[in-house]
Amino acid sequence: MEIKNLTTEQRNPATMHIDSMSTIDMVKTINKEDQKVAVAVGTQDDKIAQAIDEAAKRYSKGGRLIYIGAGTSGRLGVLDAAELVPTYGIKPERAIGLIAGGKGAMYVAVEGAEDSQDLAKRDLKDLKLNKNDIVLGLAASGRTPYVIGGLDYAKAIGALTISIACVKDSKIGHHADIAIEAVVGPEAITGSTRMKAGTAQKMILNMISTGVMIKQGKVFENVMIDVKPTNSKLIDRACRIIQTTTGVSTPEARNTLEKANNDVGLAIVMLKTNSDLNQAKNLLKAENGNVAEVLNK
């Protein structure tokens, strides 16, 4: 399909005169368009669930979440990868965002980078891609050559490939094991896919990465138990997590967190099972670090 025929490139009838609207009407119109995003993403629930299940299997075997994209799509992948480190306490090398043109492209567009399939292959080769890895290819238009090249190389290696696009029957979808296509319709500003398409991609990435982390045992009930308390805000959050899941006082939560060397999950197990540090460590080791499995026995 030619670029001009893509849904993401069509003019939106609802915003034809946005340039002459009052500020409040402008805001309301964009907001109304944004409300369509969650509905579009909802049509892909089954595919997103499939992506989570398959990705979780690979991740548990040591695989990595690797995001590839150009422009806004690439930046969203980098953002999702970066946030997983402090949120779930994973090592930075377990979630990696690749953007066409390299790190500099996060801030300034690198002309022509997205048009190279070979560039993506080289970027993935540099990471020593393997069959346990998960490659998520993002392209609002569903046709970015950089993403296609990366997905093809990943498939050849045997890695799991997931495509995320905002058009139906996307080109990248034909190069992936699982194709997620949230059709959000024309943008409020024609072709500005950082808007609805970007929001849809972010929502989908939120669900996939969160789902994978939940299945690794990094969430107990609905709290983050592998959060790394590296500043005062996160230390306070860690203590509140311990309090709300165990019912202890603030001082006891803080004291136990210190005894557990700032490991929230370990502190919870110590308190819930009335164990000392080593006993709690052994309980967690027996359940591969899964707090819920320890406490549900």
Swiss-Prot record:
Sections of the chain in a coiled coil: none
Keyword Cytoplasm: no
Active site (record annotation): 83 (proton donor), 114
EC number: 4.2.1.126
Highest taxon of the lineage: Bacteria
InterPro entries with a match to the protein in the record: Etherase_MurQ (IPR005488), Glucokinase_regulatory_CS (IPR005486), MURQ/GCKR (IPR040190), SIS_dom (IPR001347), SIS_dom_sf (IPR046348)
Catalytic activity as recorded in UniProt: N-acetyl-D-muramate 6-phosphate + H2O = N-acetyl-D-glucosamine 6-phosphate + (R)-lactate
A Pfam family reported for this protein in Swiss-Prot or TrEMBL: GKRP-like_C
Transmembrane segments: none
Keyword annotations of the record: Carbohydrate metabolism, Lyase
UniProt pathway: Amino-sugar metabolism; N-acetylmuramate degradation
rRNA processing found in the keyword field: no
Residue intervals of the SIS domain: 55-218
GO term, biological process aspect, one: peptidoglycan turnover
SUPFAM superfamilies: SIS domain
Note: A lyase-type mechanism (elimination/hydration) is suggested for the cleavage of the lactyl ether bond of MurNAc 6-phosphate, with the formation of an alpha,beta-unsaturated aldehyde intermediate with (E)-stereochemistry, followed by the syn addition of water to give product.
Record PANTHER family: GLUCOKINASE REGULATORY PROTEIN (PTHR10088:SF4)
Role this protein plays: Specifically catalyzes the cleavage of the D-lactyl ether substituent of MurNAc 6-phosphate, producing GlcNAc 6-phosphate and D-lactate.
Similarity annotation: Belongs to the GCKR-like family. MurNAc-6-P etherase subfamily.
Subunit structure of this chain's protein: Homodimer.
UniProt protein name: N-acetylmuramic acid 6-phosphate etherase
Gene label: murQ
